[in-house]
Design a protein with these regions (language model features):
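S-adenosyl-L-methionine
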Residues: 233-256
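Conserved G/P- and acidic residue-centered "switch" motifs that form tight phosphate/ATP-binding loops
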Residues: 189
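RNA-binding accessory domains that recognize and position tRNA/RNA substrates
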Residues: 1-183, 193-241, 310
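Hydrophobic/aromatic beta-strand patches that form the interior of the parallel beta-sheet core
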Residues: 152, 207-209, 244-246, 289, ...
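Active-site adenylate/phosphate-handling loop in enzymes that bind or generate adenylated species
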Residues: 132-134, 140, 167-179, 248-323
């Protein structure tokens, strides 16, 4: 078998689910990966699923790796060299791979795993054989199993042996879209952006809502919300994301005329909640996510959050409440 380059993707929490739920989440993860790569003009030539791993062949592995680090559900992604299961093929593959991977290293370690228990050599013995082969090719190196400069990983699976050394970390969590929709209240600040990102990581699709306060906010604030939305879009596999912009300047002006300044902030927030709930009903969202942090401002005291929550019939999700 000829050796070939392939992307190895690992995922974590998904594997803890029941077989039915896991299968559904894996399908969504694969669909999201294809969408993200396609949006960035990278063709997916083939995908193989095996034992908590995805093996992906693309038209541009180097750029694909960068994109995969922004796909929810991905724990890590690596460019791997695939060989056959013949020991000589694996040894030759590791020697070939090591010449580039260990070029600046003084010490190294081989980490072998054998999910394919039909393979006749144990993981420990295989690591020793491969380590000896590397030392013969590169005698200036030394083995250090505790604190090596570089590690080379070898996974023995039914479809072949996979050799890699770099793991690009992904966001983990669940695939985007497996938990339904939520309305995300976006202010342009860091709290609302992080809250939206965290709920996306748990598998929710977001429907961003921005309240345009007109002349009450600066042009810089409006530019900031655009930057935040652009950043969030990088993590969303959909081609288009509809942002609901609600003009609220006139309503705020009315509140200034009839509501005592002491209570104006909480009334304004209540209005935002009620509008968000109507949007949620319209789009079929099951909750509202906000960037509220307990005690940060007057409208975010426990008493006021309690009052606001009683106005709404659907769940209010506050991922950053304790930060």
């Amino acid at each position: 078998m000829m050796s070939e380059e392939v992307i190895l993707v690992s995922y974590g929490e998904i594997t803890l689910k029941s077989s039915r739920v896991r299968s559904r989440m894996e399908r969504v993860l694969i669909r999201n990966i294809i969408s993200q790569l396609k949006r960035n003009r990278i063709d997916v030539l083939k995908i193989h699923k095996e034992g908590g791993r995805l093996f992906i062949w693309t038209s541009n592995n180097k750029d694909a790796i960068k994109i995969l680090t922004k796909v929810f559900g991905v724990v890590s992604a690596s460019i791997a060299l695939k060989t056959g299961l013949n020991l000589n093929e694996i040894v030759n593959g590791v020697k070939k791979y090591s010449k580039e991977a260990l070029i600046n290293a003084k010490t190294f370690a081989i980490r072998a795993r054998r999910p394919n228990k039909d393979f006749p050599i144990t993981s420990i013995e295989l690591a020793r054989i491969l380590g000896d082969a590397v030392l013969k090719e590169m005698p200036n190196l030394k083995v250090d199993l505790n604190n090596p400069d570089k590690e080379i990983f070898v996974e023995i699976r039914r479809s072949g042996a996979y050799i890699y050394h770099e793991r690009k970390l992904g966001p983990k969590g669940f695939p985007y879209g497996v938990e339904g929709k939520v309305v995300a209240l976006m202010s342009g600040g860091i709290d609302s952006a992080v809250a939206a990102w965290m709920i996306m990581k748990r598998g929710c699709t977001i429907v961003p809502v921005y309240y345009d306060m007109g002349h009450y906010v600066s042009s810089i604030a409006k530019e900031r919300i655009m930057r935040v939305l652009k950043w969030l879009k990088e993590w969303i596999p959909s081609e288009k994301v509809k942002v609901h912009v609600v003009p609220l300047a006139y309503a705020h002006e009315l509140l200034r005329g009839i509501i005592n300044e002491r209570y104006r902030c909480i009334f304004c927030k209540a209005m935002m909640y009620l509008i968000a709930q109507e949007i949620a009903k319209e789009v079929g969202a099951k909750g509202i996510v906000t960037g509220e942090s307990l005690g940060q401002v007057a409208s975010q005291t426990l008493d006021n959050l309690y009052l606001l929550s009683r106005l709404i019939d659907i769940p209010i999700l506050r991922p950053v409440i304790g930060f």
